[in-house]
Amino acid sequence: MLSLKKSALSKLTLLRNTRTFTSSALVRQTQGSVNGSASRSADGKYHIIDHEYDCVVIGAGGAGLRAAFGLAEAGYKTACISKLFPTRSHTVAAQGGINAALGNMHKDNWKWHMYDTVKGSDWLGDQDSIHYMTREAPKSIIELEHYGVPFSRTENGKIYQRAFGGQTKEYGKGAQAYRTCAVADRTGHALLHTLYGQALRHDTHFFIEYFALDLLTHNGEVVGVIAYNQEDGTIHRFRAHKTIIATGGYGRAYFSCTSAHTCTGDGNAMVSRAGFPLQDLEFVQFHPSGIYGSGCLITEGARGEGGFLVNSEGERFMERYAPTAKDLACRDVVSRAITMEIREGRGVGKKKDHMYLQLSHLPPEVLKERLPGISETAAIFAGVDVTKEPIPIIPTVHYNMGGIPTKWNGEALTIDEETGEDKVIPGLMACGEAACVSVHGANRLGANSLLDLVVFGRAVAHTVADTLQPGLPHKPLPSDLGKESIANLDKLRNANGSRSTAEIRMNMKQTMQKDVSVFRTQSSLDEGVRNITAVEKTFDDVKTTDRSMIWNSDLVETLELQNLLTCASQTAVSAANRKESRGAHAREDYPNRDDEHWMKHTLSWQKDVAAPVTLKYRRVIDHTLDEKECPSVPPTVRAY
């Protein structure tokens, strides 16, 4: 076995002669040479290595891997950068399934799926993107099956589909739809491993445990990304004709969330620092069933299999809030109902501050076959046997509907300063939770997230194939490109203030949890803006204790905090300015949806932490890609 010294020079020598190498006990496959041309930063402190690729994908979750292997399969020299091993990406935690109108359990139609998604979005979703996603869903699932995703099966061998919230037949006029394709309750795990295998098969070049710092831009065009290799301390500049951001959400801006600790909004913050906008950050989804005390997710599939919520009186209270859909109403509806029950004194437990999810009435064989993962999770994190006891649950931050404004074909957007119309950002694309396509609008339907990853990761590859020739030479660029990013890294690595990263991060999380929560008012949101601004200012007083460049977790966590603060601040300001209730944005002082004034996307700009947040707005796309194929869905009252 090869030994690997910690100097960059010995590592580069090793990589010239092998496609696999060892680091500690971990063997990584790079699927190609990762050495490039070497240089030094202007001050001589940092060893810089340059690479040239057709396409660079930042993030190796479901969206990033689907885009990466699609690009590599099409003949593009493709790099995929990830700050952790790909199969540890947060997609692995997705449980319930992936939506598609396959019709395996009953007659179904992708147009019904589209209707449900538009309604679920509370008419903030762009209908051209929703049209594309729901139409492409069935063929995307069949592709996944061919790639090797081991879907659960019906008795006749078809892909098993379960019920999820907000899904109906006949444009909302029919009964509950069974549209969610599942791999028991470990769908994300199966999907992620399958996509990683495909990416390796198609010779994607992986740069694992590289932390993406900033986008490289020149004359308004995104020309690549600069990253920090945590293993040896080198800085890498990746030149690319297309840079694809697939870095996930920023759930860790909140105190209680279902997100992995790595969900820190890195891609969103990079876009913001580059001077481009983010969209609809005020829309943060609270999942109804996070385990009380830990935040671990209990899939909506548990209710889809027949589970139900009860309060301290043993009442199935969702029948009062959503008489038709009951426990399978949309997530924002269920989360608000739980919060109202707790407020009115019907919570359970000593503090009466949570609810119960009842599964014990389900046959043990159903729990074993369909919900093995959550049975284990409930035992470990709640100490309950689901065959005998209810699971204590509480609404928990789960998903960011907002992100990088993106067209249905994956191209990132800004707005033209002169005309106010949409304008494509040259060289930049996005997909997955980091993007705002916007198929989820103000509220995401359960199991549309994995579909989003697959459909729009695939769309990115198709768009690039239609617009870019493989192997084109790169234009000359300034030799000091990325110097601001290196200066920021150096500043944070040597920061000698009085506040730890952990202290500032905790203050941020508690502020967001308290002031930008399930129910919002002008006073709570204004206080949230003041508080998060005060927290941002303390970032200038941050202290890092580790000055090294090798496996410096203190530095990485400080960089992540910088990214989280950028996302948190824009979330609070955007929420304070939207004076209506729509989807996950529930204002007690503005309880109604206001289509006349607020059926529009929020765009927010912030160049750096503690800089002012600027807001503008762009129209919601209320037409489909082809009105003859699929007419748009006009706004109506959203009730379940």
Swiss-Prot record:
Q: Which GO terms describe its cellular component?
A: mitochondrial inner membrane; mitochondrial membrane; mitochondrion; respiratory chain complex II (succinate dehydrogenase)
Instruction: Please tell me what else the database record remarks about this protein.
Output: Present with 10400 molecules/cell in log phase SD medium.
Q: Which organism is it from?
A: Saccharomyces cerevisiae (strain ATCC 204508 / S288c) (Baker's yeast)
Subunit structure of this chain's protein:
Component of complex II composed of four subunits: a flavoprotein (FP), an iron-sulfur protein (IP), and a cytochrome b composed of a large and a small subunit. Interacts with EMI5/SDH5; interaction is required for FAD attachment.
What protein am I looking at?
Succinate dehydrogenase [ubiquinone] flavoprotein subunit, mitochondrial
Question: Which top class of enzyme applies to this chain?
Answer: oxidoreductase
UniProt keyword list = Electron transport, FAD, Flavoprotein, Membrane, Mitochondrion, Mitochondrion inner membrane, Oxidoreductase, Transit peptide, Transport, Tricarboxylic acid cycle
Q: Which residues bind substrate?
A: 287, 299, 398, 444
Q: Name one Pfam family in it.
A: FAD_binding_2
Q: What's this chain's function?
A: Catalytic subunit of succinate dehydrogenase (SDH) that is involved in complex II of the mitochondrial electron transport chain and is responsible for transferring electrons from succinate to ubiquinone (coenzyme Q). SDH1 and SDH2 form the catalytic dimer. Electrons flow from succinate to the FAD bound to SDH1, and sequentially through the iron-sulfur clusters bound to SDH2 and enter the membrane dimer formed by SDH3 and SDH4.
Q: Which EC numbers characterise this protein's activity in its record?
A: 1.3.5.1
Q: What gene codes for this chain?
A: SDH1
According to its UniProt record, which reaction does this protein catalyse? a quinone + succinate = fumarate + a quinol
Topology relative to the lipid bilayer, per the entry, is: Peripheral membrane protein
Give compartment(s).
Mitochondrion inner membrane
> What family is reported?
Belongs to the FAD-dependent oxidoreductase 2 family. FRD/SDH subfamily.
Could you tell me which InterPro entries the record lists for this protein? FAD-dep_OxRdtase_2_FAD-bd (IPR003953), FAD/NAD-bd_sf (IPR036188), FRD_SDH_FAD_BS (IPR003952), Fum_R/Succ_DH_flav-like_C_sf (IPR037099), Fum_Rdtase/Succ_DH_flav-like_C (IPR015939), SdhA/FrdA/AprA (IPR030664), Succ_DH/fumarate_Rdtase_cat_sf (IPR027477), Succ_DH_flav_su_fwd (IPR011281)
Pathway(s) the chain acts in: Carbohydrate metabolism; tricarboxylic acid cycle; fumarate from succinate (eukaryal route): step 1/1
Active site, per annotation? 331
Q: Name one GO biological process term.
A: cellular respiration
